[in-house]
Amino acid sequence: IEQFEDAPRSQPNLDSLRILVDVSRNGEMKHLRFQTANDHAQVFTEIDVDISENGHYNLHTIDFGAKLSRTDIEIKLSAEQASTKINGLAVTNGSQYHDTHLAVEHRVGDTQSAMTFRNMVDGKGEATFNGRVLIEKNAQRSATEQSVGNLLLSKTARVNPKPELEIYADDVTASHGCTVGSLNQNELFYLKSR
């Protein structure tokens, strides 16, 4: 479990984090990440993951805080039967900006990845999600799923979703989808009153 908090401050501050994960053969890692930095913080996070044979990496990431948050996640499926599952949520309000870049590389065959990411944006907030899956030519029988959902809670909120699939192999299973929606006044009132 990784929990990032900042003490309340009146001045801007910069935080930079780098996380390196190596999932060994037959290994499994469950990574829970919570980012609740103060309203003035600028938080830059880089997560690099390499997964070996029959290794599994599951990431659940939630971003609430920071004036500016940039998260770069790079996952390499380096051996057969390696898999990853990523679930993410960014809740943005005021004038916050949350920017998430996620890249998954299927380097060999018989690998699996699934990513589900959600943005909820209110006020003048803005959220960007760039999810890229690369399936190399020799990564036959790989499977990937990608789902990006965005909910705008105000007329001034903005989202920039960009799901990408780059496939060079012939024998793969791949799907991706992206939605952007908003709520009417009654739905928004109901949601905020609960």
Feature names for model-found ranges:
Residues 1-189, 193-194:
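Conserved beta-strand/loop scaffold segments within soluble protein domains that form the structured core
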